[in-house]
């Protein structure tokens, strides 16, 4: 198996078939809806809040609300009142089952539910998927996070409608250092490996540092890409604004950090400061334009045409003929 990450790979251009990049369609379908771009902000407290989620939904983007210090029932009611879809996160503990029961009692069903735990290839996840499929069969269930083909096969067989791939590649994740496990440093290879066995959508989660990494993720099998740090330093980001030497930053921390947990126990995340770099709308528009450019370089007109592009591994022997054919 080839081992590489985003910075080690470049995609090879194919003959352009459009007169303008704006002709390229960066849209992607997930769970019966089509979204403008294959990007979803990380479901973290310093990346998304209710206002950002509502704006994303109204403007044709996918979102997943975080699950920390949140009344999920009220959140879904608020989203329904605004006339937009609801997309929430759940864990696998008793309060999460209670939340599902509350939805059933109220006759409410979020359109999307993400089972969001650090090690998603688990019996606890299997039980939660089964419970959701029984109680809220209309909801589209995303489950994760995982790192191996075996895990993707299991989650799909258990009933997940999509899987989230990536353990520890994020900028504020220290799972690799704390545990010795994860996809940090080879996330793109892990994605390729998992996508080979997947029959349902994969959301690549973590390790995205540049907009070009979105296209690389699509090329190696992702349907959607979850991004934290690039969307944490925006004017609207919910993280606390901090001034250092006259420059403005946003606080950004991992979901398993002591900053998020409020206690120093089983910590696998850290806190950093992200420079403020513009607005959400401008950033997403730039991402869309860059993805359109990627599609044109791939010789395509729609997002999945990127998968037809060949690639080279920088520093590798590139001996496989398929790379350059």
From Swiss-Prot:
One Pfam family, short name = IMPDH
Q: What EC number(s) does the entry state?
A: 1.7.1.7
Q: Which residues form the active site?
A: 173
Please name the Gene3D superfamilies in this protein's record: Aldolase class I (3.20.20.70)
Q: Which GO terms describe its cellular component?
A: cytosol; GMP reductase complex
Reactions accelerated catalytically = IMP + NH4(+) + NADP(+) = GMP + NADPH + 2 H(+)
Keywords associated with the record: NADP, Oxidoreductase
Protein residues bound to NADP(+):
202-225
Return the protein name.
GMP reductase
User: What InterPro entries does this protein map onto?
Assistant: Aldolase_TIM, GMP_reductase, GuaC_type_2, IMP_DH/GMP_Rdtase_CS, IMP_DH_GMPRt
UniProt-listed SMART domains: IMPDH
Q: Which SUPFAM superfamilies match?
A: Inosine monophosphate dehydrogenase (IMPDH) (SSF51412)
Q: Which organism is it from?
A: Polaromonas sp. (strain JS666 / ATCC BAA-500)
């Amino acid at each position: 198996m080839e081992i590489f990450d985003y910075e080690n790979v470049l995609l090879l251009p194919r003959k352009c078939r459009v007169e303008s990049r704006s002709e390229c369609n960066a849209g992607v379908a997930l769970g019966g809806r089509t979204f403008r771009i294959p990007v979803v902000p990380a479901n973290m407290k310093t990346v998304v809040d209710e206002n950002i989620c509502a704006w994303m939904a109204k403007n044709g983007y996918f979102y997943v609300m975080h699950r920390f210090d949140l009344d999920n029932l009220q959140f879904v009611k608020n989203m329904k009142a605004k006339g937009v879809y609801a997309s929430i996160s759940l864990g696998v503990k008793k309060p999460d089952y209670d939340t599902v029961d509350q939805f059933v009692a109220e006759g409410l069903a979020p359109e999307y539910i993400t089972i969001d735990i650090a090690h998603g290839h688990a019996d606890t996840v299997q039980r939660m998927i089964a419970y959701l499929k029984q109680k809220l069969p209309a909801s589209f269930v995303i489950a994760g996070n995982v790192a191996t083909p075996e895990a993707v096969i299991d989650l799909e067989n258990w009933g997940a409608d999509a899987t989230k791939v990536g353990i520890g590649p994020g900028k504020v994740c220290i799972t690799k250092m704390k545990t010795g496990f994860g996809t940090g440093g080879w996330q793109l290879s892990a994605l390729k490996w998992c996508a080979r066995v997947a029959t349902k959508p994969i959301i690549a989660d973590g390790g995205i540092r540049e907009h070009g990494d979105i296209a690389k993720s699509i090329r190696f099998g992702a349907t959607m890409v979850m991004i934290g740090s690039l969307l944490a330093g925006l004017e609207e980001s919910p993280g606390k604004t901090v001034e250092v030497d006259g420059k403005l930053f946003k606080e950004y921390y991992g979901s398993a950090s002591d900053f998020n947990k409020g206690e120093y126990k089983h910590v696998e995340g850290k806190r950093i400061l992200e420079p403020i770099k513009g607005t959400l709308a401008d950033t997403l528009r730039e991402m869309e334009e860059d993805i359109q450019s990627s599609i044109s370089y791939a010789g395509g007109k729609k997002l999945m045409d990127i998968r037809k592009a060949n690639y080279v591994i920088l520093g590798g022997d590139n001996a496989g003929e398929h790379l350059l054919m």
